[in-house]
């Protein structure tokens, strides 16, 4: 299991939101590129970047993404507001290792086949955000009629190299995790699962490692000091 610190960018700053809601910023740090560099220096092997302005439909933080790429050596996975094939290609071509595609993939699954054919499966990740066991889109504002498992099977066939699974019901609340949806995903697809949402302690990491999760994204718990990256990395295999 690989531990991936999150760097969420909004209005040019590193922030942490509660359940993705604008106006709920609980952590605000001025320089996202420096934050990313510090996580790398502390041992992170991969970085998870979220352009919240992109995800919320209010613009992009492309210059900051470029700065993070320049200042760090670790592979970067990036999501948030990728609304077209050209958006995805631009990010892949400036040095983002893996693009995380959510709403666009749900609307047009064939895009995943196109991108994975051109750039390789390992560079294409599909984000499945789950609320009440239904996949939600458009920054968690709209609900679909399909479960995460239904979509995960579809995108595995389409050539996605990994699935980022976020349980919106627990995301940012620091109340711990719900294992059942993750176990179901692990039992139904063979591509790597990246888990995000509700992690509060190293005990959560131990359980996720024990059930076979491949990657874990940690945000709020790191920024609020509930877990240190040093302790989290003890569960890295």
From Swiss-Prot:
One of its GO terms (biological process) is L-histidine biosynthetic process. Its EC number is 5.3.1.16. It holds the Pfam family His_biosynth. Keywords: Amino-acid biosynthesis, Cytoplasm, Histidine biosynthesis, Isomerase. SUPFAM superfamilies: Ribulose-phoshate binding barrel. One of its GO terms (cellular component) is cytoplasm. GO terms for molecular function: 1-(5-phosphoribosyl)-5-[(5-phosphoribosylamino)methylideneamino]imidazole-4-carboxamide isomerase activity. The active site is at 8 (proton acceptor), 129 (proton donor). InterPro entries: Aldolase_TIM, His_biosynth, HisA_bact_arch, Isoase_HisA-like, Isoase_HisA-like_bact, RibuloseP-bd_barrel. It is an enzyme of class 5 (isomerase). It catalyses: 1-(5-phospho-beta-D-ribosyl)-5-[(5-phospho-beta-D-ribosylamino)methylideneamino]imidazole-4-carboxamide = 5-[(5-phospho-1-deoxy-D-ribulos-1-ylimino)methylamino]-1-(5-phospho-beta-D-ribosyl)imidazole-4-carboxamide. Pathway: Amino-acid biosynthesis; L-histidine biosynthesis; L-histidine from 5-phospho-alpha-D-ribose 1-diphosphate: step 4/9. It is found in: Cytoplasm. Its main location: cytoplasm. Belongs to the HisA/HisF family. This is 1-(5-phosphoribosyl)-5-[(5-phosphoribosylamino)methylideneamino] imidazole-4-carboxamide isomerase.
């Amino acid at each position: 299991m690989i531990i991936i610190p999150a760097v969420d960018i909004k209005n040019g700053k590193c922030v942490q939101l509660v359940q993705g809601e604008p106006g709920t910023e609980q952590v605000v740090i001025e320089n996202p590129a420096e934050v990313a560099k510090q996580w790398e220096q502390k041992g992170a092997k991969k970085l998870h970047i979220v352009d919240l302005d992109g995800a919320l439909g209010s613009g992009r933080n492309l210059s900051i993404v470029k700065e993070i790429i320049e200042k760090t050596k670790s592979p970067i996975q990036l999501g948030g507001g990728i609304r077209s094939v050209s958006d995805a290609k631009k990010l892949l071509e400036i040095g983002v290792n893996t693009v995380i595609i959510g709403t666009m993939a749900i609307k047009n699954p064939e895009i995943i086949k196109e991108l994975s054919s051109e750039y390789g499966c390992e560079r294409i990740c599909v984000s499945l955000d789950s609320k009440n066991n239904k996949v939600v889109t458009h920054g968690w504002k709209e609900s679909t009629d399909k479960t995460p498992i239904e979509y995960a099977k579809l995108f595995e066939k389409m050539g996605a190299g990994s699935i980022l699974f976020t349980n919106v019901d627990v995301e940012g609340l620091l109340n711990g995790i719900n294992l059942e949806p993750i176990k179901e995903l692990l039992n139904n697809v063979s591509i790597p699962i990246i888990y995000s949402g509700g992690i509060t302690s190293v005990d959560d990491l131990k359980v996720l490692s024990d059930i076979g999760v491949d990657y874990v994204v940690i945000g709020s718990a790191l920024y609020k000091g509930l877990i240190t990256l040093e302790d989290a990395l003890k569960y890295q295999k």
